[in-house]
Amino acid sequence: MHPYLTGNIPGTGGIFKETPEDFLVTEIPIYTPCGEGEHIYAEIEKRGITTLEAIRRLAKALGIGERDVGYAGMKDAKGITRQTISLPRVAPEQVLGLELPGIKVLSAVPHRNKLKVGHLRGNRFRIRIGGVGADAATIAIAVLDILEKRGVPNFFGEQRYGAQGNSHLIGGAILRNDYRGAVDALIGEPDKVTDERWRRAIEAFKAGDLAKSLETFPPHCRTERELLQKLVKQPEAHEKAFRAVHPRLRKLYLSAFQADLFDRVVQQRMDSLDQVVHGDVAFKHDNGACFLVTDAAAEAPRAAAFEISATGPMFGCRMKEPEGETLAMERRLLETEDLTLPSFDLEGGLRMEGERRPLRVPIAEIGVEADGAGLFLEFSLPKGSYATTVLREVMKS
């Protein structure tokens, strides 16, 4: 469990995501489509499905390849999400005429280029917390005031780690070429799931009955089923079986491993989250550039003004390294995983170059509104940052 930046303030408690309407996220785009070109930028509202599942449904309905579909940010299945998807070689009328479960097309405008991951400014959130006390709004305002001044700890959200919270374990096994371990981690543990059929499928796998496991896995566990179909034929060919996993998912597992290591660094730096030290690689919030801190005292006013922040590692074979004690700490972390930076130079389109990620991010457009026994929070965060971190600080649960 991550520590709190606002641990001296009690939480509101309560629950959220009781209904999809309790969690609304809207992408903030960098640019709008120009009105001409072979790609259609479709703003969709999805409900109860992931971005990848939305892409599958759209691609199938339009007869295009999933890999040809572009998106700026990955969103999970919970709540309601409004985001833009790019679709090649189709007419706006085709897209606007779609009627698909879990997806509503809000607009469709042509553009010249495919939408790339990261092509968004951030996300705006409107979240309802239910079952809170009469002082919840006062508590939330106090917490958000500190987060506005010091920054939001840039932890990755739990959705980064998958339904069982094990995606980083799969990614770590891939990096160590431990494909038996990767398969075991992907199938997971029976006590991590609540679906009875899913639990029995995992237990059958653990008992070595691959055929029964394949037969028992629910249809929505598509990746597990595809992997087991290979293993049933060749039980010891773990690496070959793992190739059945969609390349996008393999990338997600590797990214989850990066995220786990980064989160550990944030935990270690929590008390000094709004400071920089000698040897840090600092991040400029106005343009995303990074530089090495050689005079921490001289840079302290810029950190206090939220112009710059210390960064942590998203490890990769070409990642810019810090110096001094910051470097020593990051290398110790890699050593605990029996890895070095060259370990991330993978083949098969899985090469991870790495980057620096700020340890904190600004929160903006803050709003708090009492709603009977509930509480509405509104705020925006930069791309790649998670609302769940803000909710943890507010709710302390």
Swiss-Prot record:
Keywords: Isomerase, tRNA processing. GO terms for molecular function: RNA binding; tRNA pseudouridine(13) synthase activity. Residues 151-361 form the TRUD domain. It comes from the Bacteria. One of its GO terms (biological process) is tRNA pseudouridine synthesis. It is an enzyme of class 5 (isomerase). The active site is at 76 (nucleophile). GO terms for cellular component: cytosol. InterPro entries: PsdUridine_synth_cat_dom_sf, PsdUridine_synth_TruD, PsdUridine_synth_TruD_CS, PsdUridine_synth_TruD_insert, TruD_catalytic, TruD_pseudoU_synthase. Its EC number is 5.4.99.27. It catalyses: uridine(13) in tRNA = pseudouridine(13) in tRNA. PROSITE patterns: TRUD, UPF0024. Pfam families: TruD. Responsible for synthesis of pseudouridine from uracil-13 in transfer RNAs. HAMAP family: TruD. Belongs to the pseudouridine synthase TruD family. This is tRNA pseudouridine synthase D.
